[in-house]
Amino acid sequence: METLITISRWLAKQHVVTWCVQQEGELWCANAFYLFDAQKVAFYILTEEKTRHAQMSGPQAAVAGTVNGQPKTVALIRGVQFKGEIRRLEGEESDLARKAYNRRFPVARMLSAPVWEIRLDEIKFTDNTLGFGKKMIWLRGSGTEQA
């Protein structure tokens, strides 16, 4: 549990996620501002359905991605690598996520793009501020945490 708490605190301070999707052997990555839900261990993003990554995702798809800062020194590197699933939200689920997203990013109120959820199933957090190469791993549903 401590691993997930540590990762969640760090993710709550960041705001841009990179995620990649695959369809029929073709890969594509995208970036977006995100809202992180620590209870669901999920990112919420807005992206238009006409984008290449949304078209490749369809209503639901496997994803992998990263969140990282841009430190100028190796000793300060921190970042997350993850895998999970992306899906477009509908109805009340979408409405609730959009309200929370708009609170974090008020400018998003002007956007009509659909809300998507990236549910994280595996997270590897690298935190060199705790020692070079220090990694923490969280796996959904396994009850295991590795530090």
UniProtKB/Swiss-Prot annotation:
SUPFAM superfamilies in the cross-refs: FMN-binding split barrel
InterPro entries: Split_barrel_FMN-bd, UPF0306
Intrachain disulfide bonds: none
Origin: domain of life: Bacteria
HAMAP family linked to this entry: UPF0306
Family designation: Belongs to the UPF0306 family.
Protein name: UPF0306 protein YhbP
Gene: yhbP
